[in-house]
């Protein structure tokens, strides 16, 4: 139920300035490069931990996905791994699809 899920999951929002601050501080203090979305997760984790607790957050993208933004925030050039660079230079492959689940399901079943 919605109530059961809401009891287990919390959410928060951050301003662009707070996100940038988290990225800068983490890079400066830990030499770990966050992407903007990861910075939100990391900051929420840090703010939500109780004394003595340890937590885990997950990054879903390499900071190079947001290259100009990340470089502007940390004031340094981000080195892109060779495999990622090759992938980013490849041809985009996508399929136009409606938002209807039935269309998605039919596509998957047609494979």
Describe these PLM feature segments:
Residues 1-111:
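PLP-dependent amino-acid enzyme catalytic core
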């Amino acid at each position: 139920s919605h109530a059961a899920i809401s009891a287990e999951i919390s959410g928060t929002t951050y301003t662009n300035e707070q996100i940038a601050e988290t990225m800068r501080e983490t890079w400066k203090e830990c030499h770990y490069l966050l992407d903007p979305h990861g910075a939100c997760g990391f900051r929420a984790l840090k703010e939500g931990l109780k004394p003595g607790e340890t937590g885990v957050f997950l990054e879903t993208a390499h900071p190079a996905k947001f290259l100009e933004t990340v470089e502007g925030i940390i004031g340094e050039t981000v080195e892109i791994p060779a495999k990622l660079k090759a992938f980013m230079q490849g041809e985009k492959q996508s399929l136009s699809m409606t938002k209807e689940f039935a269309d998605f399901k039919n596509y998957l079943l047609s494979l």
